[in-house]
Structures are given as structure tokens and as C-alpha cells.
Amino acid sequence: MLGKKKIPIVFEDDSLLVCEKPAGMPVQSDTSGNVDVETYLKHYLFEKQEGDGEPYLTAVHRLDRPVGGLMVFAKTKEAAAKLSRQIQNHEFEKCYQAVVCGALPEEFGTFEDMLLRDGKTNTTKVVPA
């Protein structure tokens, strides 16, 4: 069911799980039928546990399908609530890096583009600002 793709787990304790999401993999299940990070991790936790029942696991933030990087998951409702508050209070820092082709006009700066979402296909693409 989960295929051969491995998702590296960077940190795990009783409350949190941090993994390295591969680029091209959705965080949650969608209509594509592809394996998603959340299902993979729930399977991993189910295999580790000593009881029956589905383990609690929820993503506390999102990364788009084309993006790879670290993902934080809460393993308890209490951890999910605390992390949600931290995000709302801007105490949760995210840092993005990008690979670009060609030469940039400046070494440093802010480069902005708009995202166009297609609700029918559940896809998003960059359009020039």
C-alpha cells in the first residue's frame, strides 16, 4: 500500500513528529490516489504501537505537493492545540529556500509572484505578478 518511498523522520517524541516531506508527495490524501505523508506516518505509528486503534496524528502546517521540506505533526490533541496557538501568535518560524534557474537581477531581495488555484483539478501554479 505505501510503496517503496521512505519518509525520513528527523525528530519524534510522545507529542511531536518531524519528518522530511519529499517533493511531489501530498501532505494529506487527495483524489490522485498517491501515497500521502499523513497516511504513511499513521501506518508507521500503528506498526510501532502496542494496542489497537488508529494513532492520533495531525499536520500543524502545510507544504504544497511540489515542495519538499520539514513537516511538523502533532501526536496528541494537546500538542496540536499548543502548536496552533504558536502559529497564530507568530511564534512558529518557517524558512523557505528555493532553487532558481538563470541569473537573478539582485543578490538579495524580495521576489513576488501570484498563485493561481484551479479548484477543478486542485492544482496551483505561479503566474507573474
Can you say where each PLM-predicted feature lies in the sequence?
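RNA pseudouridine synthases
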Residues: 1-129
